[in-house]
C-alpha cells in the first residue's frame, strides 16, 4: 500500500530535512551509525512503534511479533542505483518513506513492477516527495526499481526481518557502511 502524504503536518517538513543525517554517498546506512536530529528520531520512533507494527500486521496478514526491525537511511542516489530487484528473503515487510521537499525530476521515482524485466511495466509509481510512503510484503516477485537518478534523494527504509536474519543483515550493512568511508 502507499500513502502520498503520510506526514500530514507540514510544519515538520523543514525540521525533518535539517535533522536528516548528512549522507553524501550512495547506499544504505544503518540508523545506529548516523547522527539523527530530534525530528528524525521522532519519525523513526513512530515508524518503529507498536501502532505502526499493528497496522502492517493487519494490512499484510502477517505476525510481526518478536520480529526484529532494522531502519536504514539513504541520502544520495547514484546512477547505478534503482536497478530492478526484489528484496532479500531475510525481510518480511519493507516500508519506505521519502523526505524530499521538492522533486522536479522524472527519474528517481520508485516503481512497483509487474515483472523483473521492464521498468516501464509498472503497477504504481511512488513520488519521491516529502511524506510519500510505500509498504509491501516481501515476496520472490515483489519487483521494484526506478529510472537512474544521481543526486540528493532522502529516504528512510524500515524492514521487519525473520528472527534468524538479524545478525546477517546487521553484519552486511555495517561492513558496507564501513567500506563506503573509503570508496
Give the positions of each predicted feature.
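Fe(II)/2-oxoglutarate oxygenase catalytic core
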Residues: 1-135, 139-183
Amino acid at each position: 500500500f502507499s500513502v502520498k502524504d503520510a506526514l500530514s503536518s507540514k510544519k515538520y517538513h523543514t525540521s525533518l530535512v535539517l535533522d536528516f543525517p548528512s549522507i553524501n554517498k550512495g547506499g544504505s546506512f544503518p540508523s545506529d551509525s548516523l547522527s539523527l536530529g530530534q525530528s528524525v528520531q521522532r519519525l523513526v520512533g513512530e515508524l518503529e512503534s507498536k501502532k505502526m507494527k499493528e497496522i502492517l500486521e493487519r494490512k499484510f496478514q502477517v505476525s510481526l511479533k518478536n520480529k526484529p526491525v532494522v531502519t536504514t537511511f539513504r541520502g544520495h542516489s547514484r546512477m547505478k542505483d534503482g536497478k530492478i530487484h526484489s528484496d532479500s528473503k531475510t525481510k518480511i515487510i519493507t516500508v519506505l518513506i521519502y523526505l524530499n521537499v521538492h522533486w522536479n525530476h522524472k527519474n528517481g521515482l520508485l516503481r512497483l513492477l509487474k515483472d523483473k524485466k521492464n521498468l516501464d511495466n509498472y503497477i504504481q509509481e511512488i513520488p519521491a516527495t516529502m511524506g510519500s510512503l510505500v509498504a509491501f510484503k516481501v515476496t520472490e516477485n515483489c519487483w521494484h526499481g526506478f529510472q537512474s537518478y544521481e543526486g540528493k534523494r532522502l529516504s528512510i527504509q524500515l524492514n521487519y526481518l525473520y528472527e534468524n536474519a538479524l545478525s546477517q543483515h546487521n553484519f552486511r550493512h555495517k561492513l558496507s557502511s564501513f567500506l563506503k568511508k573509503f570508496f
